[in-house]
Structure formats: structure tokens, C-alpha cells
Amino acid sequence: MRSISTCLILAVVGLTAESMAASNFGESSIRYAVVGDSYSIGEGATEDEAWPALLARHLTKSGQATELVSNPSRTGWTTKDAIENELPLFCAARPNFATLMLGVNDWVQDVEPATFRSRLAHLMDEMLKVLPNKKRLLVVNIPDFSVTPEGPKYARGRVISAGLAGFNKIIAEEAQRRGLALVDIFPISQQMRDRSELVATDGLHPSATAYTEWEALIFPAARAALEP
């Protein structure tokens, strides 16, 4: 309820925030905010090498001025953590473009699929309340970390790929229900099995090279979402 109240309060003062943003960045600029976990802050590389940072620079280079105004993502965070800690900051940032990439830690922590669906749906709906253009929420699904050297340690008797695929199905269904574009990162992430340069030194997270390849996959969907 705290996050809902925060969003509603900020919605009331939204016109003022929008005016300030327009004054600072120009009316045609994109204010990009991120809701995510370790994959969105570039764990295994640096935040500057994370795919959201790369995406903001790529969009700007392509002619669409983009400012990464908020990325409070944290390693280990679940959808519950994002609702409690990231959503208020997302609302305060007053973005007009956003990406959402969450779910891996829900699965690791044995969150029930129905609970994950409910929390994910809440996140999507609250983010959409903030965005002026509802097609500008881009969803990225969960990569397959089971193919990394350290990934199997998190199985605990479960089949990781199958479990993540099940959560990705939920993500796809909730995105489709709201007419949101979805980038499927799962197949390209499986290249970490055979390409050691795609795995960070921790043996679990993607390397800077991998994040660069992910961004190349995400960029066309982001560019399409930003078209008038």
C-alpha cells in the first residue's frame, strides 16, 4: 500500500515534475527508469557496462536523447523487494520510458508461481500508472543462469531451466495481457554454456561482453516502443 500511495501522490504533482523535466532535458528527451535486479545493474561487470546504461547511450546515439534517471536495482531482489523499495523511486523519477526485468530471485527463493504472478502484475500496473504512454514499458524476461559454472548450486533438487521457463511463461502472459512488448533473453543467455567470455569472474553472472550482446537484442524493441 505504501508504494501505491507514493505513486498516487506523485501523480498529483506530475505536471510540475513533467514541466521541470522538460525544462532540464528538452521536450523530446526520454527519461528512462529501470526496475530490476542484479542483471539490470550489471552484476559481474560495472553499472556503466550494464545493459540499461548501454541502452540509454545507444538510444541517444541513434538520435533519441535518453537520460537514465533511475536504476535502483539490487542484487538478490525479488518482486516483493521491488514493490517495497524500487517502485517509490520509480514513481518519483517521473519517467516516460521504462524497462522491467525481474523474477530470477523469486524462483531461487521458492516464491510460489501464483504469488510471483500477483506481485509482477502489481508492479506492471503501478508502473503503467506513471508512464504517460502505456506502450513504453518494455519487459525483459529471465536468463538461464543454469548454464553458468556456479548456476547448478542453486538447483536444490529442482531443474533450473524448466523452473525459469515456467516463470518466463508467467512474465509473457502478464505482458501480453497488458499489450506490452517482451524481449526474450532466455535463448541468448544459454550461450554462456559454451562461451566462457560471456560469464563474469564470479562464475554466475554475465560479463560485460554478454551485457553488450543482450543490449543489442533489447535495443530494437526499445526503439520501436519510443516511436511516435
Model-derived features: positions:
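Positively charged n-region of N-terminal signal peptides that target proteins for export
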Residues: 1-4
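Short active-site-adjacent helix-start/loop capping segments
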Residues: 42, 78-81, 106-109
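Residue-level signal for threonine
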Residues: 50, 78, 207
